Regions:
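C-terminal extensions of enzymes
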Residues: 2-6, 11-12, 16, 21, ...
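N-terminal capping/small domains of soluble enzymes
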Residues: 56-241, 334
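Active-site beta->alpha loop and helix N-cap motifs at the rims of alpha/beta catalytic domains
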Residues: 217-218, 227-334, 546, 556, ...
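Conserved, mostly hydrophobic/aromatic
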Residues: 224, 290, 327, 342, ...
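A solvent-exposed, charged loop/short amphipathic helix patch at secondary-structure junctions
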Residues: 238-253, 391-412, 529-537
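Generic structural signal for well-ordered alpha-helices
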Residues: 263-275, 304-311, 339, 360, ...
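Short, surface-exposed connector motifs at secondary-structure boundaries
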Residues: 316-325, 340-349, 433-438
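Catalytic alpha/beta core domains of metabolic enzymes, predominantly
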Residues: 336, 348-500
């Protein structure tokens, strides 16, 4: 039995050992304020034939016992019913209740879900008549939470927008939230995935607000030092006490050690949210991507040691379960050595700081040979497009003599990451790689708006033109822009469509793009256009040159700077705690 098979067996065993929870226990959890735990039990671990009856019974119990409940219990039950109604109309039932692999008799129908949501809404309206104080408390909390999320989505005046979304009562909140979920283009991609029409999964490119992203169908999370820090800033009431506890438990620890522990806590919180999806899919999805210390980008042994230590810690925190985590490694020679070591042990990785085919081809082969259940190869599309754009703008006068204006070059640059992703997908399919296990992942998405980009198919080609790839990880503001577009006719296999020839005619003037796009292997790509050959093709063995290549250099520098800032924030918190104690 291979390592991968043993890992999958452990996941199956954990799911099989999940205890069956009765109605009384679920009501007890509600009384204790644990309504998310109740929701997860119902939606992910209750067998479909029992689901409707159990939900009806819980609503009946709430209605009968509500008048005699404590005030905290009443508020919790109203909150539960509201979230229950939203979950019913979200993507979440697709993971288990609407599972297309089941026959009609063992699945819940959309009609049944709609009926349950309607019943929950009626019950809320009835109970809320004599609980106006609880309604006010809940809507105030929702406005605060949603305002934080909308701020991350770069919405102007997020407090005002949150107030409009929540409305004056729970009924308005349910109506508006449901409409928002149903109109989401990102949700549309997830729905295609649920139907088996596209392999593309959507991911939350953020270490916060995963609960909302999961309503839209997110099944993956990508984290790096800036994103972990952002999660802390987004919810200081939650994470300040956690950081303080970590500092107090080990006051003499180095800043680096404390940064690792804080990262671990934020990652673990996201892992727990995705854990049911991970179990239900036998480890095929439901992962959190955790970046090792970016300062070790050229030290394979340090990266491996850090990953193994964290993996072991997470295993313990999960009670011996297989951690639903993949480790971000840089697409460098040292990263390749670390990749082979970790995946040989069955530990999944996400190859990051990736921009070019000379990186992707090597790592795809290594991951195919590895033992991990799932690994990903990230193409950082926007972080490639901007250096390409800047390079072309630097020669705009020369290009003008060839009839290429600024609008054409800006538009072409926006295609550069898309072009690399399409080529990567093409070559991996041509080689017969297992694309369910070795997944191309598109990250660093950009929104292109204004007159220079009117010729693009959409303002977000990094999404619309690569559907059909393994994973698309979406930053909140990009998802907001994508969802703000009119309902789209999504193409399930858009990644297979070629890049327009006129775009490549412009991009051949960029050395940065040619370095990224060029394969240089006649066996892999005999039809390759020699006009797209860079002056000095890179390979991973040229580690010093790779680290100096503009997109790699810029990204590693930013990650290291962000990691330093993260450590500084922790040090500031340590100093503050010391002053408070003194």
């Amino acid at each position: 039995m291979t390592k991968r098979e043993r890992l999958k067996n452990r996941i199956r065993e954990e799911l099989a050992q999940h205890p069956k929870i009765d109605r009384g226990t679920l009501m007890g959890w509600l009384a204790q304020g644990e309504y998310r735990r109740v929701l997860e039990e119902l939606f992910f671990f209750t067998e479909s034939p029992e689901f409707v009856h159990l939900c009806q019974g819980i609503m009946q119990d709430i209605e009968m016992s509500f008048p005699s409940m404590r005030e905290s219990g009443q508020e919790c039950c109203l909150g539960f019913l509201a979230e229950f109604s939203i979950w019913l109309q979200s993507y979440l039932p697709n993971w288990h209740l609407l599972n297309g692999d089941k026959d009609a008799l063992s699945s819940v129908s959309e009609r049944q879900l709609t009926a349950l949501a309607a019943r929950a809404a009626l019950l809320i309206a009835k109970l809320a008549q004599d609980a106006t104080g609880h309604v006010g408390s809940l809507t105030a909390r929702w406005r605060k939470d949603i305002a934080s999320r909308l701020a991350a989505e770069s919405v102007p005046n997020p407090q005002q927008a949150a107030a409009a979304l929540v409305g004056e009562d729970i009924g308005s909140y349910l109506t508006n939230m449901t409409a928002s979920l149903r109109s989401s283009n990102a949700r549309g991609i997830a729905d295609l995935h649920a139907k088996g029409a596209t392999p593309t999964e959507i991911s939350n490119d953020y270490a916060a607000f995963l609960d909302y992203a999961m309503l839209l169908g997110a099944s993956f999370v990508t984290c790096n030092p800036p994103l972990v820090d952002i999660a802390w800033v987004a919810d200081p009431e939650r994470w300040n006490p956690v950081v303080d506890r970590i500092v107090q438990e080990d006051p003499g620890a180095s800043s680096e050690a404390l940064a690792t522990k804080v990262t671990l806590e934020i990652v673990l919180a996201n892992m727990r949210l995705l854990r049911p999806v991970f179990l239900l899919t036998e480890g095929c999805t439901g992962y959190v991507s955790l970046q090792v210390n970016p300062r070790n980008h050229d030290n394979s042994s340090a990266m491996v040691s850090e990953a193994i230590t964290i993996y072991s810690d997470l295993e313990k925190k999960l009670g011996g379960g297989v951690p639903n985590v993949v480790f971000k490694l840089p697409a460098t020679h040292a990263g390749l050595v670390a990749c082979r070591d970790l995946t040989g042990q069955g530990i999944g990785v996400n190859i990051t700081v990736g921009f070019g085919m000379f990186q992707h081809v090597e790592f795809a082969q290594a991951l195919q040979e590895g033992e991990a259940i799932v690994s990903t190869i990230t193409n950082m599309s926007g972080r490639l497009a901007f250096p390409v754009r800047d390079e072309l703008l630097g020669i705009v006068g020369r290009l003008a003599k060839s009839g290429i204006g600024e609008v054409e070059l800006r538009e072409a640059a926006a295609w550069s990451g898309v072009a690399v992703v399409k080529r990567l997908h093409q070559l991996m399919a041509r080689r017969g790689y297992d694309l369910g296990r070795v997944k191309p992942l598109v990250a660093s998405l950009r929104v292109y708006e204004g007159g220079a980009y009117e010729g693009l198919p959409t303002p977000v080609p990094d999404i619309s033109e690569v559907i059909g790839v393994g994973v698309i990880t979406i930053f909140p503001n990009v998802r907001r822009a994508f969802d703000a577009l009119p309902p789209m006719k999504l193409r399930p296999h858009a990644v297979e469509s070629p890049v327009p020839k006129n775009v490549l005619d412009v991009l051949r003037h960029s050395e940065v793009f040619k370095q990224a796009f060029y394969v240089g292997d006649p066996e892999l790509l005999p039809e390759e256009d020699d006009q797209l050959r860079p002056d000095h093709p890179l390979c991973l063995d040229d580690e010093a040159d790779v680290l100096e290549w503009t997109p790699v250099r810029n990204t590693i520098a930013e990650f290291c700077k962000s990691y330093d800032a993260f450590e500084t924030r922790i040090e500031d918190r340590r100093q503050l705690a010391g002053r408070v104690v003194a």
